[in-house]
């Protein structure tokens, strides 16, 4: 009887120890991709946000552009509390690493979004994007962002594959001074020449465009001297053209 009691006590002791034994540690690889997982919570898997949300795609954008935006969020030129908190204590060299990581991702774009814009509104948006408005000294979007609107090197982003609401919000932020870039702030200057209906039109048209296969930022080409002059852009290091 005593031996049975001893055996029962031993089993109880062993099972109790097993119940409270610490779990084996989970080993997470210390890679840049792993450290940047928090970015995916908002920007989507691998930074390829969908077209029906507010947050932008960051995968495949020019590294110099992404780096400049990370600096802008960290240093207060762009206002977003989540981004500011995430970047507050990050060094410049680490921001460059982050930018290079996302710039190197080559991922497919989602299909074009649906739209409720009228044909007339879309036609107006297409004219602004492709031709600009000389009467208001508005160059075409394609003059800076590339003929295919996929961005130009080293630091001008593409405009395709972005949600309409995000595009409108950014134009509004430039207009009201909520968003800033390194002086001279060309987008602030140009966006203030847009009427609200124009901003809606060009955003609706851009969000509706299909993405050409293999779309990449390109080397900028010389622009025609007959169009509106392009202002200097401090964030891209480009002189007036």
Language model segments and positions:
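Extended intrinsically disordered, low-complexity coil regions enriched in Ser, Thr, Gly, Ala
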Residues: 62-84, 161-172, 176-185, 222
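Flexible coil segments in periplasmic/lumen-exposed cytochrome c-class electron-transfer proteins
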Residues: 22-36, 45, 81-153, 173-241
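Bacterial N-terminal signal peptides
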Residues: 2-16
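Short cysteine/histidine-rich metal-coordination sites, predominantly Zn2+-binding motifs
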Residues: 56-61, 144, 157-165
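Residue-level signal for nonpolar/aromatic packing positions in well-ordered secondary structure
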Residues: 9-10, 66, 125, 144, ...
């Amino acid at each position: 009887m005593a031996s049975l009691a001893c055996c029962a006590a031993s089993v109880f002791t062993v099972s109790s120890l097993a119940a409270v034994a610490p779990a084996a540690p989970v080993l997470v690889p210390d890679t840049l991709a792993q450290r940047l997982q928090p970015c995916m919570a908002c920007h989507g898997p691998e930074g390829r946000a969908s077209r029906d949300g507010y947050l932008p795609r960051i995968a495949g954008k020019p590294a110099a552009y992404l780096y400049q935006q990370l600096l802008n969020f960290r240093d207060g030129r762009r206002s977003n509390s989540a981004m500011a908190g995430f970047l507050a204590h990050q060094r410049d060299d680490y921001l460059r690493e982050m930018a290079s990581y996302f710039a190197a991702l080559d991922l497919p774009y989602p299909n074009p979004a649906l739209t409720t814009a009228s044909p007339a509104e879309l036609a107006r948006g297409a004219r602004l994007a492709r031709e600009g408005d000389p009467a208001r000294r508005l160059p075409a979007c394609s003059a800076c962002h590339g003929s295919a609107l996929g961005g130009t090197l080293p630091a001008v982003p593409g405009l395709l594959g972005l949600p309409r609401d995000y595009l409108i919000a950014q134009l509004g932020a430039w207009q009201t001074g909520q968003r800033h870039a390194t002086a001279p702030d060309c987008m602030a200057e140009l966006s203030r020449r847009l009427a609200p209906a124009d901003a809606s039109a060009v955003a609706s048209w851009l969000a509706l465009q299909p993405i050409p296969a293999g779309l990449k930022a390109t080397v900028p080409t010389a622009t025609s001297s007959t169009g509106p002059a392009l202002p200097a852009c401090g964030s891209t290091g480009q002189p007036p053209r």
